[in-house]
């Protein structure tokens, strides 16, 4: 069983939450969103805990992996926090709108040896 924390409980976050709980090998442990109402809705649907900060969600000792489905401007911060905590991470696209910030993020985490995946669902569309 993989215990997952979800950062972001908006439209895409809800979709990820449903996918997580429909997989018998996964368990949604905690949810964080700046909008507490959204976090509570998703957490209640999934029997998960609402965390008060992204740091609490990522550093929760039960959590083995992190899904990032928050606003784009938070992605780099959350990727770095997750990588430094040693948690494999799936982050929704885009990483950021500024390529220099993306490169800085890469340089900060590249030697941490933590899997980070970006969710590009239409990589090969024409």
Regions found by a protein language model. Name each.
Residues 10, 32, 72, 95, ...:
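Short loop or secondary-structure boundary microenvironments that flank
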Residues 16, 48-108:
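Beta-loop-alpha module in the N-terminal Rossmann-like domain of NAD(P)-dependent dehydrogenases
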């Amino acid at each position: 069983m993989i215990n997952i924390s979800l950062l972001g409980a908006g439209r895409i976050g809800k979709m990820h939450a449903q996918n997580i709980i429909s997989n018998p090998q996964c368990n949604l442990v905690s949810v964080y969103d700046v909008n507490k109402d959204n976090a509570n809705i998703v957490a209640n649907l999934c029997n998960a805990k609402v965390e008060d900060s992204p740091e609490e969600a990522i550093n929760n000792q039960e959590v083995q992996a992190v899904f990032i489905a928050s606003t784009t401007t938070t992605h780099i911060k959350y990727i770095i926090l997750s990588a430094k905590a040693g948690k494999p991470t799936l982050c929704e696209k885009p990483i950021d709108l500024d390529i220099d910030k993306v490169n800085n993020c890469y340089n900060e985490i590249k030697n941490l040896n933590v899997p980070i995946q970006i969710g590009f669902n239409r990589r090969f569309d024409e």
